[in-house]
Amino acid sequence: MENTEQEHNLPEGDETQWPNGVKRKRKNSQCSMNSTSDKSISVPGYVPSYLEKDEPCVVCGDKATGYHYRCITCEGCKGFFRRTIQKNLHPSYSCKYDSCCIIDKITRNQCQLCRFRKCISVGMAMDLVLDDSKRVAKRRLIEENREKRKKEEIVKTLHNRPEPTVSEWELIRMVTEAHRHTNAQGPHWKQKRKFLPEDIGQSPAPTSDNDKVDLEAFSEFTKIITPAITRVVDFAKKLPMFSELPCEDQIILLKGCCMEIMSLRAAVRYDPESETLTLSGEMAVSREQLKNGGLGVVSDAIFDLGKSLSQFNLDDSEVALLQAVLLMSSDRSGLTCVEKIEKCQEMYLLAFEHYINHRKHNISHFWPKLLMKVTNLRMIGACHASRFLHMKVECPTELFPPLFLEVFEDQEGSTGVAAQEDGSCLR
């Protein structure tokens, strides 16, 4: 009897063979020849190298994108299977055609039950689908592993960076010794420093404007300026290659770098506990005292530099090499041996960079950050040059030590102090 005949197996396509032999389109079918809304659209994307070209999905035959839940499938079937398991939807699936639908990339959206059964029959594993908590944990683990790999790459890069050569180690040794022999009090500066009395230079006189110089504080600073300048000169004379330069170039370089090196030496002796800098290894001063004693805004720049450098944990060699780089600045106006000075600075910079590699600081991008301090020090030197003119107006000439004037006054056309008999320049 017709009403008892069983439904035949479905033929290819989305047509259904009914018992009476009449072929009918499924209700709500979106696969008619005139419809383009459900045509498979292949979106180009990443395809793993282990897949053959245009390898098909084992569920629907669409282009596969990789192994998903233990089978080679497309993104659509992967997502369908995952959603079904995560939301426990399969008990509610049903088939109108006796569970014998053919699943391909055209019909896959028409019967959820047959599609799910096809997923299971080809070997997709339900136990590999993660619930929300496991999925979050997996993503967290992936991120942690990614960060771990990044850190390993950084460590690997650090280990592969070149360290000083034998000749560079010798250069570093000589520069370090030059610094240690000319750096007042050395590592014992904290024990030997004396604090400038609090009543000196703390605030401008009430009747004066904010840019007046506190003469008492200025007078205290001038007592230590001459030995501080002399130590910078002595440091330069001990450096390889500096004494080979013409006397005129030596003077230009010393005048240009003197304030920069003195500022660096003060900045590395910043004490965060007392919020003071120690000048010339002996006089501890506050920001306001240094500012009101003549330096003005330059004081802020030096203190800010000190705060920043306190995080760098520089050793004597790094401070010494910074000073050498500042000294051998080939862009100082009036130099004659520009190329020679530039090559000298390059030698110091290369040895410096290799020494930084050897030290392996924990600060990221340590080398470029440290080079930025050279720029900061150059700006301090430039600001002090204009500030010096203000001090000359505000302070009596007799308060200025001769060497202070000689180094910081503009003496175009003059070489300053005459050369000594041994050919060295400045005192």
Swiss-Prot record:
The keyword Transcription regulation applies. Residues 1-40 are annotated as: Disordered. Keywords: Activator, Developmental protein, DNA-binding, Metal-binding, Nucleus, Receptor, Repressor, Transcription, Transcription regulation, Zinc, Zinc-finger. Residues 29-40 have a biased composition (Polar residues). Residues 1-56 are annotated as: Modulating. The keyword Nucleus applies. One of its GO terms (cellular component) is RNA polymerase II transcription regulator complex. Residues 1-11 have a biased composition (Basic and acidic residues). After the mid-blastula transition (MBT), expressed throughout the deep cells, which give rise to the embryo proper. In adults, isoform 2 shows highest expression in the eye and liver. Expressed in adult gonads. Residues 57-131 bind DNA. It is found in: Nucleus. Interacts with ncoa2. PANTHER family: NUCLEAR HORMONE RECEPTOR, THYROID HORMONE RECEPTOR ALPHA. Belongs to the nuclear hormone receptor family. NR1 subfamily. This is Thyroid hormone receptor alpha-A.
